[in-house]
C-alpha cells in the first residue's frame, strides 16, 4: 500500500494486498479495513465454475481512483459539522447521505451512494454464503457491476458488454474484477452453461471489438507463502 501511495500516486486501500497475503483456499474473506480484522466464509459452489474473462483493455488507475476517493471524502466533510462522530463513509447512513445530496455535486453523491450500497451488498453476500445461496451471491455481483458502472463510473464499454452478455447467457453472477477501466469480469457460471457462455463471449466480443478476450477457469487459492 505504501508503495502505491508513494511511488505510483494511487491512494489505494489495503484490500488487494491483504487478500494476496491472507487469502485461504476455498474461502472468501470479509475484511474490516479500519480494524484489520477479517473473517473467512466458505465458497463451495457445487455445480458452478468461476470464470475470469479478460477484455485485454489496459487501465491507468492513479488519478481516476484518487478523484473517487476525494468525492467520498467530500461527502464526509460536508456531514461532519452535524455528525462529528463520523470518520469515513462507513459511518454514514442512508439518511445522512440524503441530507448531503443537496450540498454536494451530483457526482459525489452517486459515488458515495455506490459505497454505501456496496457495504450492504458485502453483508448480504456473507449471509448468503453461510446459507449456500449462490443465486443471491450472483444477483449481488450484477448489482455491484452496474453500481460500479453507473454510479462509481469505473467500468468501460467492454466490461459492460461482457456483463450484459453474461446475463443473456444465463450466467448467475458477473462483475468487474479489480480497479476497473478495463481488465476483467469474474463470472459465476453453472456447469451446464459453461461451454455456451465461453463460446458466445469469445465470438460476440471479437465481433464487437476486433480482438478476442482471454478466458480462464479460476479457483480461490491460498495467499502468498514461502515455497519449499
Residue ranges and their predicted role:
Residues 1-17:
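Glycine-rich, mobile lid/loop segments that gate access to catalytic sites or pores
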Residues 22-173, 188-228:
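C-terminal nucleotide
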Residues 182-188:
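Short, small-residue alpha-helix embedded
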Amino acid at each position: 500500500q505504501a508503495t502505491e501511495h508513494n511511488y505510483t500516486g494511487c491512494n489505494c486501500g489495503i484490500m488487494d494486498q491483504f487478500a494476496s497475503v491472507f487469502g485461504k483456499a476455498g474461502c472468501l474473506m470479509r475484511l474490516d479495513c479500519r480494524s484489520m480484522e477479517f473473517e473467512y466464509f466458505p465458497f463451495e459452489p457445487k455445480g458452478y465454475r468461476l470464470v475470469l474473462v479478460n477484455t485485454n483493455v489496459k487501465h491507468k488507475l492513479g488519478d481516476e481512483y484518487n478523484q473517487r476517493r476525494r468525492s467520498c471524502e467530500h461527502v464526509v466533510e460536508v456531514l461532519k459539522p452535524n455528525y462529528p462522530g463520523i470518520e469515513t463513509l462507513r459511518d454514514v447512513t442512508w439518511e445522512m447521505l440524503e441530507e448531503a445530496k443537496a450540498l454536494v455535486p451530483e457526482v459525489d453523491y452517486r459515488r458515495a451512494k455506490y459505497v454505501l450500497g456496496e457495504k450492504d451488498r458485502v453483508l448480504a453476500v456473507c449471509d448468503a454464503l453461510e446459507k449456500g445461496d449462490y443465486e443471491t451471491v450472483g444477483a449481488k455481483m450484477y448489482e455491484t457491476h452496474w453500481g460500479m458502472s453507473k454510479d462509481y463510473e469505473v467500468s468501460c464499454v467492454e466490461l459492460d458488454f461482457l456483463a450484459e452478455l453474461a446475463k443473456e447467457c444465463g450466467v448467475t453472477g458477473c462483475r468487474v474484477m479489480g480497479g476497473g477501466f478495463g481488465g476483467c469480469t469474474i463470472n459465476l457460471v453453472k456447469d451446464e452453461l459453461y461451454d455456451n457462455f465461453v463460446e458466445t463471449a469469445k465470438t460476440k466480443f471479437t465481433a464487437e471489438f476486433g480482438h478476442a478476450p482471454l478466458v480462464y477457469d479460476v479457483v480461490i487459492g491460498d495467499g502468498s507463502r514461502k515455497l519449499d
